[in-house]
């Protein structure tokens, strides 16, 4: 009986820990966006975008990285994939057909900030996973950082 109770308690603990890990990752994503916005305001667009596009810079932290869209869904900066810079990704769909970039643009324009949920291939696991991207509008830019759940 004690072994069963111990196993149940371990299971409850692990579920609780995974929830905390997700919350801290979401907090890290929003903090990275806020840090990027502060850097942009302090240093201007050119210097900020050069740093955002640097895969070894201060705005790429493990799986977290900054990317910037304009108000139409064009990529202006990307911390891990420079090939996307200048591309209109507004019509990009996830595996379920969701126009998640357009949803993010619409959300940022309407509310200023928020989270967009969609499914995307995790480059680490190579599997389609649930992902959430935090978007925040500043001037005519949308600062973004995503997390896998």
List where the protein language model places each region.
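N-terminal membrane-sensor/transducer module of prokaryotic signaling receptors
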Residues: 2-149
């Amino acid at each position: 009986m004690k072994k069963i109770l111990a196993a149940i308690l371990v299971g409850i603990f692990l579920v609780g820990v995974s929830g905390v890990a997700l919350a801290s990752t979401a907090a890290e994503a929003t903090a990275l966006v806020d840090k990027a916005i502060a850097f942009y305001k302090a240093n201007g667009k050119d210097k900020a975008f050069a740093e955002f596009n640097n895969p070894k810079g201060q705005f790429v932290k493990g799986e977290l990285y900054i990317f910037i869209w304009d108000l139409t869904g064009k990529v202006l900066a990307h911390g891990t994939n420079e090939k996307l810079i200048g591309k209109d990704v507004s019509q990009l769909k996830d595996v379920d057909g969701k126009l998640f970039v357009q949803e993010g643009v619409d959300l940022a324009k309407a509310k200023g900030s928020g989270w967009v949920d969609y499914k995307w291939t995790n480059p680490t696991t190579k599997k389609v996973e649930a992902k959430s991207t935090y978007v925040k509008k500043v001037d005519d830019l949308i600062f973004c950082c995503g997390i896998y759940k």
